[in-house]
Amino acid sequence: MFFPSLILAAGSLSTLIQAIPHGAKHHHSLHRRAAATYAVMGGDGEASDGWPTISQWSEYETLWGLNQILIAASCDNSDDETSDINTSIKSIASETGVDARFILAIIMQESKGCVRVQSTNNGVENTGLMQSHDGEGSCNKDGSKTTPCPSSMITQMIQDGTAGTTQGDGLKQCYEAQTGGTAAKYYKAARTYNSGSIASSGNLGQGGATHCYASDIANRVRGWAGDVSECVEATIGTITSGVESALGGDDGSSSTSTSTTAAQSTETAEPVQTSSSAAEQPVTTEPIQTSSAPAQAAETSSAASSATSTETTSVAPAPTWTPSSNVQVAAQTTTPTPSWTTKSAPAATTAPAASSSASGTAPLYPYASSSCQKYYTVKAGDFCDKVTEAVGISFLDLRSLNPGLDEKCSDLWLGYQYCIKA
């Protein structure tokens, strides 16, 4: 029996957190947990440059809880599939010595935790949850999706990205190739995993591929998990230090996932203009490597614990990682990435008009009928019942014209044009 869905397309995870639909799955109750704000990190990843140390990373269970909300909002995973990600992360972390928090951060950066994420190819086939180097694990081979995604395949995806493949390094190899403090080696490993190398300057915001990659990962392990990074690709390479110098914390040789995080801080980091780009005890130690971010991917985070932060005198207090009840979400760009789109409660607004032909500005939903004659652009606050009522078609017709829509209509993409007549 079909039940009208209340999952919507909107622009901010904070709206989703405040308006979970009735009958939502139990993991949505995690919305009361705090999420850290984003702080742009530039330079070489070392604590001396203001990057967070291992002691400033959030605990794994906190990170998992916050990112679980984003996975639910961004993907078509079943509860079992999402649970299998959690189980596999901890298992592979134990086998490889790679910190479970780091593995989770890379998964969220690369695929937003969507088990049926498509592969990408920029000269190398990047597959699965971690977009590994020619990995064997995938539940979306050549556009053919596997549902349900077997737990063994989910484990294989995480194995490929963490331990490496026959064709390329994983996180473990990337980590072991680095020097410096434990946390810095992770940030450097993240950059290597993304681009294959680090710029000769040592600045993690320079070089190829995604310039903000290391900054994003440093924020993720610290408790941020937003939809869109507040780091600016065009300028991050000019920044030579982080914004967290005022925070204490040793960067010892061992990493522990039970460490506390900065709680109340003196001042939140100023938001930066955004740019877009594609479990029990966590196991820690030394891990890590490589690939470019996929076109289909999804993000949001956690924080909060015991330690209090210090306040500076005279000069303005340094920006710090302040826990916040609402995730910082950047404004949507002109070409939003589908899996990064979050859904929220419907707004009481009039329905936007449908267009008789594809718009030149809004992107087409990739699974729309190839013979489509009329389109509708999804607006903030839209949900399937609202769209079908506005354009005068049934939900079954909407699905037949846009085969990518699931039966619960849980994956409307904000800003995309859907077919409403063929």
Curated annotation (Swiss-Prot):
Full protein name: Secreted LysM effector LysM1
Species the sequence originates in: Penicillium expansum (Blue mold rot fungus)
Gene that produces this protein: LysM1
Bias kind Low complexity: ranges: 253-270, 289-319, 330-360
Gene Ontology MF annotations: chitin binding
UniProt keyword list: Chitin-binding, Glycoprotein, Signal, Virulence
Function: Might have a role in sequestration of chitin oligosaccharides (breakdown products of fungal cell walls that are released during invasion and act as triggers of host immunity) to dampen host defense.
Region (Disordered): 242-360
Organism lineage string: Eukaryota, Fungi, Dikarya, Ascomycota, Pezizomycotina
Keyword Glycoprotein: yes
